[in-house]
Amino acid sequence: MKQVRLPSSATVRAACAVAVAALAGCAQIPRDPIIQQPMTAQPPMPMSMQAPGSIYNPGYAGRPLFEDQRPRNIGDILTIMIAENINATKSSGANTNRQGNTDFNVPTAGFLGGLFAKANLSATGANKFAATGGASAANTFNGTITVTVTNVLPNGNLVVSGEKQMLINQGNEFVRFSGVVNPNTISGANSVYSTQVADAKIEYSSKGYINEAETMGWLQRFFLNIAPW
């Protein structure tokens, strides 16, 4: 009868550890976009109406000549002038100094005078702490992007969002924008600055070799997760 030799438990554990490490390392860290709402919206189709036979034909798609041309409906477009310039500086410091001195004169009994004639105790302590810290950041983002009105709030404000994709060589660049626009801040050129947009979310990301070069490798991420230091 032929005997089958099974692998030892240590070998099985080592194989399982290697398999788990490989699976854990292959897992990519997803980068969730900060803008979760839809990037565009289409206006509802108007109800078909019989043409009255006159020059004036009412309807959703109609843009009267003497009416305000600023966006106000779902599906209208608006140009956002991105002009973000943020500078932040922070500094802090702490300084503590504490000193103490204590003396004790202990009287001794007469029969112990020869042994403890000078029983004087003294204690001196000092504690000093000094620390400083500072941080600074500067971010600048300029550009333009045309967005779409995705919702109209009850007070008339417009919820807008949009995305621009640019394929440069072998890298795909993404610019995403969303926020709430007050129609009164829209200029005659159908544009508004990003500094006038409430709840603005601006995202600039890319996909390609440059982005992959900036991403930590799977094996390095694995050892970084299990390293105790």
Curated annotation (Swiss-Prot):
InterPro entries: Flag_Lring (IPR000527). It is a lipid-anchor. A lipid is attached at C26 (N-palmitoyl cysteine). The keyword Membrane applies. It is found in: Cell outer membrane; Bacterial flagellum basal body. It comes from the Bacteria. GO terms for biological process: bacterial-type flagellum-dependent cell motility. PROSITE patterns: PROKAR_LIPOPROTEIN. A lipid is attached at C26 (S-diacylglycerol cysteine). GO terms for molecular function: cytoskeletal motor activity. Keywords: Bacterial flagellum, Cell outer membrane, Lipoprotein, Membrane, Palmitate, Signal. Residues 1-25 form the signal peptide. Its main location: membrane. It holds the Pfam family FlgH. Assembles around the rod to form the L-ring and probably protects the motor/basal body from shearing forces during rotation. NCBIfam families: PRK12697.1. PANTHER family: FLAGELLAR L-RING PROTEIN (PTHR34933:SF3). HAMAP family: FlgH. Belongs to the FlgH family. The basal body constitutes a major portion of the flagellar organelle and consists of four rings (L,P,S, and M) mounted on a central rod. This is Flagellar L-ring protein. The gene is flgH.
